[in-house]
From Swiss-Prot:
The gene is speA. It is an enzyme of class 4 (lyase). This is Biosynthetic arginine decarboxylase. Pathway: Amine and polyamine biosynthesis; agmatine biosynthesis; agmatine from L-arginine: step 1/1. Keywords: Decarboxylase, Lyase, Magnesium, Metal-binding, Polyamine biosynthesis, Pyridoxal phosphate, Spermidine biosynthesis.
Amino acid sequence: MSNWSIKDAYVGYNVNYWSSGLYGISEAGEVTVSPDPNHPEHTIGLNELAKDMVKSGVALPVLVRFPQILHHRVNSLCNAFNQAITRYDYQSDYLLVYPIKVNQQQTVVEEILASQVSKEVPQLGLEAGSKPELMAVLAMAQKASSVIICNGYKDVEYIRLALIGEKLGHQVYIVLEKLSELKVVLEEAKKLGVTPRLGLRVRLAFQGKGKWQASGGEKSKFGLSAAQVLNVINSLKDEDMLDSLQLLHFHLGSQIANIRDIRSGVSEAGRFYCELQKMGANVKCFDVGGGLAVDYDGTRSQSSNSMNYGLTEYANNIVSVLNDMCREHDQPMPRLISESGRYLTAHHAVLITDVIGTEAYKPEDLQAPDEEAPQQLKNMWDSWGEVSGRADQRALIEIYHDVQSDLAEVHSLFALGQMSLSDRAWAEQMNLRVCYELKGVMSGKYRFHRPVIDELNEKLADKFFVNFSLFQSLPDAWGIDQVFPVMPLSGLDKKPERRAVMLDITCDSDGTVDQYVDGQGIETTLPVPAWSAESPYLIGFFLVGAYQEILGDMHNLFGDTNSAVVRLDDDGLVNIESVLAGDTVADVLRYVNLDAVSFMRTYEELVNLHIQEDERANILEELQIGLKGYTYLEDFS
């Protein structure tokens, strides 16, 4: 009888550490979500939720959003800073600014803004990094504090739109990223009769560690050097507009894993702030940018997929460093701003889809090679016998290496025409048989076994063909080796019988999830319950709410997935709302300037030319349905 428990499942998939308490596993072995931490007793089973959506006509894959998680993340971050401000007697306040580049979906932005609708003084603003984003936030920022921060490269039109935002009642901070922007801002402000609110992005010497570390340091794409900062100060003094400089901004990069890097960046930027104040500037806001990390792998480490600090520690470090510096230099304490988009959005979205097929190794009975067989085959047969005879633990490693060497020789001889196809097939099957036997007798308790066990897991892993596009739904997994938690949505009440790798349905060998979160850290395979064609086998990809949608591409013309907003009411009842259909085939063809209407005319011509009259209507109907259909697989039975 198995001693497997739900606790083992939590450990095996490291759920307690990457989920922030928002996702869990029920006693029935199904993955759950608790979208409203104020009511942790109210949970949603993701497996049943997906089945209900399919019954209602929502085809998989589907991206499911939980807006209550967005509300929780906003308020948690604001509360962390508010408590730190109280703890250190910091003499100013905190503003959370959401950079919409992280996820520009209307539902996401509106839910973030709605999270503080009941607050007398909302602590929310919006950030734009381009003209399209600015046009969006100009129409939405009034739902919160009306604070807008404008980053990125700016032309005259961008700058004029930002200044017009002031006329619309917003507080718009135009952050100077390049020295040349200052002249344009001042000229256009005079034309419009607007007093601009200026910000400076300073280029720090300090550079944090991580995948986005190029955002900081002396060679960073954006920001002003110390000399350029002085140039701006002198230019503003000459124009008698030094009071317009109201914000200091820096950015170490997204996903800063080490809290020491954050402290170092705040400390250096704090010195800039104090020096600017001494020069007569009136900087009122200190914007630390992004960097607040998400613990994707749950290791609480300095890994680029993790973080070695918590939310309280993050806020305490920023507040305490700037508090001490301002007191030391007798300077007023500025309003603190952070642009923490990844932290706000990552957890709120889950991609749910189905496994449409598998390829698994099953041991086959093999006959012993005859006397005339190549020596390599005889060696492999003998090695298998040694495993079956339970060789000592260190000898198992040698057996594995010997078999791999023999197999490599078989492949070489086959390529040279010195070995038959049947011999090669036998050798490959025997290799898998030996690996299968070795995996059964080797143990992770022996340190010297572990590297080989990892190799065996990879060699023997089942292939799960999953109905999604890695390039569309998890582009960072492909592009920068970002890790996302992956879990089967059911069957977790039993010990996993297999290990598997997830393959998407694109015609690209890169469409493979290469890294998986488990209790041992990051692995190349995922423990899974056995697959059965008798019932749907659903997979969840978690923490996909930040960047993935907008970065996703249309490789093989797989388009946007279906999406749905799911909310719990006060009684714990599930409401599926705002279901948005994903791209149809016609939609993605139009995106690459292919005209579905003209295609239909061509189909009609070809049908009339090649198809018998009694079949034409049915064929044309199928072609039309194909153009209107979902880009993902809908019927694979």
